């Protein structure tokens, strides 16, 4: 898959020094160290999950039937018990799931980003990590970026992880959302990110009530408010965006921001999803994400692609408003653009990093295949992924995770993380 969405049949792909060195119909020259038989499989770019919370995976299924507000309150209570050890174990479990389902890079906004970055470093996956900063600062209180605890944490993870292994791990600034922080924190983080060349991750206009409340409190929408305080002056990846005003869309389009649509998590929590066609029309880069395993149930980006297409087609009463090729681009090219990786990944292209997956098309639900692109979006599942490769390194193949001791991770989850978060708080 390249800019033209070309599909080659019976093709060969050669990988050298972590990059795609050849794509063609004839056998490449030389004797490779490793040969992978792709008979009956489709090679495609690895998927980019542009919004998730890996370290919350330990809470999967705990709050499934609660309403959104109740679930959020309970989740925050449990998360207050989290420590670095439980966060890393949970992140490792989430990474294993992502790799199993063909994700090669994530944008993660959560607590303990140092633990998540360490998990990414150990496993070989790509990722942009951001601290989900939150807290109100009293108007009378002096704010000092250098001494603020969360700002210091951002500086520390940036110095430790940003650019790790030739950019495999990147650090973004982040805030949880407008409604649990304020302008002093925003401006401090925004200015630091601008100075250091970092992107920004945040939740924005997730619900209509969020937008209405912000308008009542400030006279501005969340996007207008954050723009006034410089947060949109850096490349922004905004998750949610279901309740943007037309003025908001114009602002985000002008800023070349990314809106991340999380249709599966939204549907599970009875929330509306962002209107994709009008968001794209406004000039906004639209990418896809799962949200956390708590919100979505799983981290399957194939489900996300399918649900994004279904939801928009129902809303527009017109399948042409969001064709399968556009959805696949959102999960690959647009995600790479959001992460600042558009020159290295998101396509199968000579010279790009070998971030690719093989999808087994011999399963009954993928036969016959009259159209590879539509089959990937409407028929394939994460479980059909047979191999996941990042920068030329195989990180998942046929049930094996070469860089993850899954047994040890599960023992950490069941023996430490679950008791830490749940049993201590009973």
Name every feature range the model reports, one short phrase each.
Residues 117-242, 247-249:
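Metal-coordinating catalytic core of metallo-dependent amide/deamination hydrolases
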Residues 58-89, 128-148, 208-233, 255-258, ...:
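Active-site gating loops and adjacent loop-to-helix segments of metal-dependent hydrolytic enzymes
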Residues 60-125, 150-164, 414-425:
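Alpha-helical scaffold segments that flank or form the walls of functional sites
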């Amino acid at each position: 898959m390249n800019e033209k969405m070309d599909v080659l049949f019976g093709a060969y792909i050669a990988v050298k020094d972590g990059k795609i060195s050849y794509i063609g119909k004839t056998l490449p020259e030389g004797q490779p160290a490793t040969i992978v038989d792709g008979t009956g499989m489709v090679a495609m770019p690895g998927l980019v999950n542009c919004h998730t919370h890996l370290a919350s995976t330990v809470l999967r299924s705990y709050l499934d039937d609660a309403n959104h507000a109740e679930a959020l309150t309970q989740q925050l209570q449990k998360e207050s018990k989290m420590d670095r050890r439980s966060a890393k174990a949970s992140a490792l479990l989430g990474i294993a799931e992502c790799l199993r389902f063909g994700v090669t890079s994530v944008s993660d906004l959560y607590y303990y980003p140092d633990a998540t970055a360490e998990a990414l470093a150990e496993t070989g996956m790509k990722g942009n990590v951001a601290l989900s900063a939150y807290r109100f600062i009293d108007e009378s209180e002096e704010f000092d970026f250098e001494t603020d605890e969360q700002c210091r944490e951002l500086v520390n993870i940036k110095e430790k992880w940003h650019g790790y292994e030739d950019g495999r791990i990147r650090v973004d600034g982040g805030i949880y959302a407008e409604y649990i922080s304020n302008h002093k924190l925003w401006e401090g983080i925004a200015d630091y990110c601008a100075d250091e060349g970092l992107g920004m991750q945040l939740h924005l206009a997730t619900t209509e009530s969020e937008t209405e409340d912000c308008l009542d409190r400030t006279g501005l929408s969340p996007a207008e408010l954050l723009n006034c305080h410089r947060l949109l002056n850096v490349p922004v990846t905004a998750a949610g965006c279901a309740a943007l005003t037309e003025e908001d869309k114009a602002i985000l389009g002008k800023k070349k921001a990314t809106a991340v649509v999380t249709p599966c998590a939204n549907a599970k929590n009875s929330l509306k999803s962002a209107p994709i066609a009008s968001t794209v029309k406004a000039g906004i880069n639209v990418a896809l994400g799962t949200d956390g395993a708590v919100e979505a149930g799983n981290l399957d980006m194939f489900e996300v692609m399918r649900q994004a297409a279904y939801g928009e087609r129902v809303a527009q009463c017109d399948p042409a408003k969001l064709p399968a090729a556009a959805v696949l681009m959102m999960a690959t090219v647009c995600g790479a653009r959001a992460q600042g990786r558009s020159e290295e990944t998101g396509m199968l292209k000579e010279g790009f990093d070998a971030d690719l997956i093989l999808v087994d098309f011999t399963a009954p639900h993928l036969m016959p295949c009259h159209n590879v692109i539509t089959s990937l979006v409407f028929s394939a599942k994460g479980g059909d992924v047979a191999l996941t490769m990042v920068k030329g390194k195989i990180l998942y193949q046929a049930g094996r995770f070469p860089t993850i001791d899954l047994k040890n991770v599960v023992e950490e989850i069941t023996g430490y993380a679950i008791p830490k978060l749940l049993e201590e708080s009973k």
